[in-house]
């Protein structure tokens, strides 16, 4: 599926892995990246259900952009177990301008194919996706 705005296609495996996370709950997180020629969005990393939140945040590169999905489990004040699927556009300040522009221009089209996202975030540094921030946004 090509993105009309940026010309970037989405590899079919991206939607397959998202479906596995959403419906089958096989994964804790998925990160997606653009291939080296900025022509296609592909699966970068997949974390299994036992993966910690720190492992997820540590998987995000300091100097490059990513799209990420995180399945966050939590317990409400009423002691009810819940889950929220987060979509994160990771665009660190230190990333190259070209990368930031292409990720931003492809963001809406890519995100629109991921039905079931409950919380969206854009982050430029780790503080914007701290565990406390995620907990606050999940409620």
From Swiss-Prot:
Cytoplasm is among the record's keywords: yes
Cellular component terms (Gene Ontology): actin cytoskeleton; cytoplasm
An example Gene Ontology biological process: actin filament depolymerization
Database matches in InterPro entries: ADF-H, ADF-H/Gelsolin-like_dom_sf, ADF/Cofilin
Cytoplasm among keywords: yes
Gene3D superfamilies noted in UniProt: Severin (3.40.20.10)
Domain ADF-H: 7-139
Main location: cytoplasm
Entries under PROSITE patterns matching the protein: ADF_H (PS51263)
Organism domain of life: Eukaryota
GO molecular function: actin filament binding
Protein keywords: Actin-binding, Cytoplasm
Subcellular location: Cytoplasm
Tissue-specificity statement: Expressed in all tissues except pollen.
SUPFAM superfamilies, per the entry: Actin depolymerizing proteins
One Pfam assignment: Cofilin_ADF
Family, similarity comment: Belongs to the actin-binding proteins ADF family.
Function, in words: Actin-depolymerizing protein. Severs actin filaments (F-actin) and binds to actin monomers.
Designated name of the protein: Actin-depolymerizing factor 3
